[in-house]
Design a protein with these regions (language model features):
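Conserved catalytic cores of phosphodiester-cleaving nucleases, focusing on short active-site segments
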Residues: 150-176, 190
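Polyanion-binding surface elements
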Residues: 266-286
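A short, Lys/Arg-enriched interface patch at domain edges and termini
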Residues: 310-329
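Major-groove DNA-recognition helix of helix-turn-helix-type DNA-binding domains
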Residues: 281-306
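Residue-level detection of the helix-turn-helix DNA-binding "recognition helix"
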Residues: 239, 243, 292-293, 303, ...
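Metal-dependent nuclease catalytic regions and adjoining charged, substrate-binding loops involved
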Residues: 181, 189-267
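Metal-dependent nuclease catalytic cores that hydrolyze phosphodiester bonds in DNA/RNA
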Residues: 1-148, 259
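Short helix/strand-bridging catalytic loops that position acidic/His residues to coordinate divalent metals
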Residues: 167-181, 223-224, 295
């Protein structure tokens, strides 16, 4: 693992990273190839604020070397004037490694970071000199040159921590983020990478901080079974990437006509109590008990209660594992 690579340099490196690997298994190679040849700008406000929050959380002493507050006025001139634009462009050219934020956005990043740093888990490992912060590792998986850059890794405890800024850090809210952004895949990718690099990670923790005051935090881990299951898709991504690189062929969705079965998606993934009982071959009473025990959210559709099939499947697994309220024991 190396500390000699900046965040911008890491993202510019052409080795296969987690984000590209995730896109290979959730979109198609043609889209991945297009994005490789036409990279998205790295100066979007969301990306800059995310990077600023990470820097302020993990390495606040280095924050001023990478981020600065954009002046509201220059020589009494507003940002709409030519004088302001000329002087600010000169400031940017003299400081090519600095990313600029307005005062309000910069303050938000710092406030989120301060909240995250107060979480007992992060506070413990940030005070440990053994902890590795944003170090880069290069490795090979399935014959593919890959890269990894965990936010924080403590080799003594074997703990990996990834900082996530989110609109909703509640259990239900973060479950949705896990599905939408492939966080189980990310955990599997990182743990696999660190093991290939000769390290011994034991636990992958997501430390979430909300983007709005009071910037609440929460820490989550995904069940070991789900993370291990995602390793199949990590390997699939590497195999697909290698095949595309070797052949120069980056296929799209295919030209064949495909037959789609809507199934549960016809009701947007929702089932009534009776449908849930029938689908899972259980009693209605047992369904109600699971809803109450695991706090499964329901939605009223007329006189019927509807619930998400994925939420119920997760609850069944937690129940079988002896867990409760979305946490395994």
């Amino acid at each position: 693992m190396s500390k000699n690579l900046s965040n911008l340099e890491y993202h510019a490196d052409e080795r296969l990273g987690r984000s590209t690997a995730w896109k290979l298994v959730t979109t198609c190679p043609a889209i991945v190839r297009h994005e490789m040849l036409n990279p998205r700008p790295s100066d979007s406000l969301a990306l800059i604020m995310g990077s600023c929050t990470h820097a302020a959380t993990l390495e606040p002493d280095l924050l001023d070397k990478e981020f600065a507050i954009k002046p509201e006025e220059i020589d009494g001139k507003s940002s709409r004037t030519n004088h302001y634009k000329e002087v600010f462009e000169s400031m940017q050219s003299r400081n090519p490694n600095i990313q600029w934020l307005n005062r309000s956005d910069y303050r938000t990043c710092v406030d989120m970071a301060e909240s995250a740093r107060e979480h007992p888990l992060l506070k413990t490992y940030l005070s440990d000199q053994e902890t590795m912060i944003e170090q880069t590792g290069f490795f090979e998986c399935k014959g593919v040159a890959c890269k990894v850059r965990p936010d924080l890794y403590n080799p003594g405890a074997g703990v990996v921590i990834d900082i996530k800024t989110t609109q909703d850090a509640s259990e239900q809210g973060f479950r949705k983020s896990i599905r939408r952004f492939g966080y189980a895949f990310q955990a599997s990718y990182y743990l696999n990478a660190l093991r290939i690099l000769g390290l011994k990670p034991k636990q992958f923790v997501f430390l979430c901080v909300e983007k709005t005051p009071p910037y609440l935090t929460a820490a989550y881990e995904i069940s070991t079974a789900e993370v291990e299951r995602e390793l199949i898709r990590v390997h699939d991504a590497c195999d697909t990437y290698k095949k595309c690189m070797d052949t120069g062929i980056w296929p799209g969705y295919g030209d064949d006509i495909k037959t789609l079965t809507l199934g549960n998606y016809a009701t947007n993934g929702l089932l009534s109590i009776s449908q849930t009982a029938e689908h899972f071959n259980v009693s209605r009473t047992w369904v109600y008990r699971m809803i109450k025990t695991h706090k499964i959210p329901t939605l009223a559709r007329g006189k019927r209660k509807m619930l998400d099939m994925t939420d119920f499947k997760n609850a069944m697994r937690w129940d079988a594992e002896g867990g409760k309220n979305g946490k395994t024991t």
